[in-house]
Amino acid sequence: MTSPQQQPIATSFVVTLAFIGPLALLYGVSQFLRNALGVIGPDIAQELSLSATALGLLSSLFFLAFVVTQIPLGIAIDRFGPKKVMLGGVTLAAAGIFVFALAPGREVLIAGRIMTGLGCSSFFMGALAIVARERPPHRFAHYAGLLLGFGSIGTLVATAPLAEVTAWIGWRGAFLIVAAITVLIGLLVAWGVPADRPSAGHGESWAQAIAGVREALRQPGFWPLFLMHAAGYSAFATVVGLWAGPWLRDLYGHDLQARGWILLAASLAQVVALMAWGRLQVALGGYVRSIRIGAAMTIASLLVAAFVPLGPVAAIGLLIVFSVSVAYTPITTAHGRALFPDRLTGRGITLMNLGTMGGVFVSQSITGALMDWIGRLPGGAYPPAAYQAVFLYLAAFLGLCLAIYAGVREPKGPHAR
């Protein structure tokens, strides 16, 4: 029998799940597509004869598509409402997944990848705008953590489940299934997410909307935090989302399915850590200190990967530690939200996301070029030095951005915590 004390808790959980669930599922599609190449990238590269540079470019174009949409996306969210924008993105994303699945060669594969990136570009930003509209500011980091955590189910599906389905029906068949699931989730969002309502930016002219972008760029602390967005998430997306699979294959001999299960463990650790970091920021002393701690832990794990010879079990353990360390993303996101007044919410958070996705595009492109510059071994695998270069680049990039961020002060105001 349920006690009176348990009933409010159960009711609160159901209400929270009903609110965040459809948004998280749609964001999960984006997470799946971001990280799928970490498992099936070697298979696609072998089938279509792609070099490491080409594979890095293919993965990074998804993020470049995000970059080019962020400013107009922020204006659209503030003017027309996040739900409308997200539903338009579902149509484009599903079409892009379908094109990707049926691509006969590199050019069509690239076109499909870009379409999916354009379509998915609103899924997280639109969800954050809805959270900012529907929930109090002091709960934003918590809900951002829930959204990132539950949405990372897509990251989990892009590991062992994707590997198993690919082994059964091939990567093309797997992506056709994902296209159908995307449409179904879009219908759930259309039915279950609260309707858009007029915002402070609804009646703005285009000139006023663009002026709002400039105002957002001038907020104190914007640029150091922008750089932390660029370096932080790109470390995870470049390691787990792209090179961890080849690293596990080339250095430790793991096949497709083994790679999938190892990446599942790392991604599951990240999911749990995302929700934990979202709650820890107050206990750790606020946004700034929490971000410094998470970034320092991430840099340390990258340096260990670069310089310490690891056995197979230790390598898996380090990958899990890295995934936990880099999961401070909800705090970075909440710090970004705290910089902007309500009327600039859409533009502000999408500008920060421009840094996030731009950082991934740059890091994945550079690391692919580094891998090819060092070159393959006679058997076709990449040597340890190639992966060492990847880890060192990511550690240096994050370290530089952290040094610039070091002087930032804790934000104050109605959205601070």
What are these regions (language model features)?
Residues 37-38, 220-277, 363-368:
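Extracytoplasmic gate region of multi-pass secondary transporters
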Residues 69-81, 273-286:
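Helix-to-loop junctions at the C-terminal end of transmembrane segments
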Residues 5-12, 195-226:
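Juxtamembrane intracellular "pre-TM" segments in multi-pass secondary transporters
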Residues 137-139, 146-195:
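Helix-loop-helix hairpin linking two adjacent transmembrane segments in secondary transporters
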Residues 68-107:
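Conserved MFS/SLC helix-loop-helix module at the cytosolic interface between two early adjacent transmembrane helices
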Residues 112-151:
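Cytoplasmic helix-loop-helix junction between adjacent transmembrane helices
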Residues 79-89, 282-296:
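Cytoplasmic membrane-interface "Motif A"-like loop-to-helix N-cap segments
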Residues 49, 81, 102-108, 119, ...:
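Helix-breaking motifs and short loop linkers at transmembrane-helix boundaries and internal kinks
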